[in-house]
Structure formats: structure tokens, C-alpha cells
Amino acid sequence: MDVGAKEEEMGQVWWGHRAWSLLSAVRARAPLVQCITNLVSMDIAANVLLAAGASPAMVHSLREVPDFTPRCDAVYVNVGTLSEDWLPSMRAAASAGRPWVLDPVAAAASGFRMKACLELLSLCPAVVRGNASEILALASRSTAASSNFKGVDSSHCSVDAIEAAKALALSSSAVVAVSGAVDFVTDGKQVISVSNGVPMMQKITATGCAVTALIAAFVAMEPSDAIVAAACALAIFGLVGEIGMESAKGPASLRMHLIDALYCLNEETVTSRVRISLRP
């Protein structure tokens, strides 16, 4: 979708109503999201999906994929705790014909991980979401892409990865989202910026994994417009972080309050506080 014309006409008003419309659709339809995700993130990803109104399913057995995955509305694949046992399930689920989202956690950590990410990327995800270092490494097709690699945390700012994200989007035909202080979402041509969120969210493990799961739920509602779905999911998640921070004393209480905030979000808050714009 060319969001430029819509934004020029209505700006933040359009984005606010679009974000609310997608969240409302998730609440009304309760999309079933299969999550083949890392062990660290299962709890927060499931709770974020539930708070948004989706139905999470942490189903990763290869023997279940043929029966279960076709019933799902979307699939979320995360390589954070990648193992040879899980990779066939990831391949099978990604090939099942459902819209799916890839989180290439720590893509540059090992040759095995990079090879797996590139193989999954070839299976046509609707969205790829990672931090700047992950997107830079994936775009370069090299484990040596970042000499300052810092595990699952990014050693680059999100703006550093915009051009890499655009190139990756064009080569893979996926929407690519780069998380950071400002999030960027691109289809290779348009770049959308999302400015919601608070720094302390980075102190909670697996928040990136959780927002990728939320993106999958939004993509399930709008599979033909993944760039808008991804941008709105990122904005909603950042917004509930802002709301949660108003009551939080630290990372643990922020985790609790942001999940509550997601469950309680109303139209007025969403339409007035999401900060999404088309990057010139």
C-alpha cells in the first residue's frame, strides 16, 4: 500500500484510527497465532498476545505442524534459542501457507544461526523484525557484518540500518521492521517511523520478541497490508510501554503495567497518542 497519499491527506489522524481499527479487529476476531519462539520469550509473548485479544499457541512439534498450522491465522517464528530439533518445525510452519513473521534473533552469533535465518528468509515471511545489528547482519548475508556484535542487544542505532532494511525488503519481498529508540518499517520503497516507547523497555527481556508476536497478530488481520500492520503493532506496543512507565518503579513493574495497559487500551488513547509518520 502507498501510505504516502493517505498520510498527506490526514496525517496522524489516519494512523491513529488505523491502529485502533487493527487492535479492535484483533479483539473481535481473536486470531490464532502459532508461536515457534525461544524459551525465554514464551511467557511474555503469550501474555502480550492474550492482552491484545489474540489467541497464542506455543506449538513447535514437527509432528503437529501439518494438522495445526493450517488452522492458524498467523505464524510467528523466532530463532532465539535455535536448535536442530526445532528448525524443521520452523521450516514446515513457514511453508504452510499462512502469513508469518520472522524474528532473526542474534542472526550474526554463529554460522548455523545465520544459515538458518537465510533459509527461513527464503520462505517468504510477511514481516522480518529485528534490531539494527540483526537487520544489518541479515542484509549483508555475513556473520562478520558487525564487529561490535552484542548478543541479542543491538550495538547500532535503528537509523543506521535503514538502508540495509530497504535492501533486505526489496531482495526478500518482506516488510522489514527495525526496532530501536525510533522504529522504522519499510517495504523497500517507503519508510515509516514509529516514535512510541520508553528506554526502560530494553531492560525487560524478550520485549522485542513480544512485539514481533503482536505484529503477527496484526498481520493476521491485514495480510495484504503488512507494512501498516507492522507499524501499528510497533506503535501500540510502544504506547503501552509509555502508559506502563507512568506507574512503574523499574523493569519488573513496567512489564506488568504494560501488559495491563495493552488490555485496557481505548480508542481515545490510541488515536491521540500513537506517533507514526512517513519518513521523507
Curated annotation (Swiss-Prot):
List of residues binding ATP: 129
EC main group: transferase
Keywords linked to the UniProt accession: ATP-binding, Kinase, Magnesium, Metal-binding, Nucleotide-binding, Plasmid, Thiamine biosynthesis, Transferase
Pathway connected to this protein: Cofactor biosynthesis; thiamine diphosphate biosynthesis; 4-methyl-5-(2-phosphoethyl)-thiazole from 5-(2-hydroxyethyl)-4-methylthiazole: step 1/1
Keyword Transferase listed: yes
Pfam families in the cross-refs: HK
Keyword Zinc appears in the UniProt entry: no
Stretches of the chain forming a coiled coil according to its record: none
Catalytic activity: 5-(2-hydroxyethyl)-4-methylthiazole + ATP = 4-methyl-5-(2-phosphooxyethyl)-thiazole + ADP + H(+)
InterPro entries, per the entry: Hyethyz_kinase (IPR000417), Ribokinase-like (IPR029056)
Cofactor(s) this protein cannot do without: Mg(2+)
Positions of substrate binding: 58, 206
Molecular function GO terms recorded: ATP binding; hydroxyethylthiazole kinase activity; magnesium ion binding
E.C. number: 2.7.1.50
Sequence similarity: Belongs to the Thz kinase family.
Function: Thiazole kinase involved in thiamine salvage pathway.
Protein name, per record: Hydroxyethylthiazole kinase
Organism in which the protein naturally occurs: Zea mays (Maize)
Protein's gene: THIM
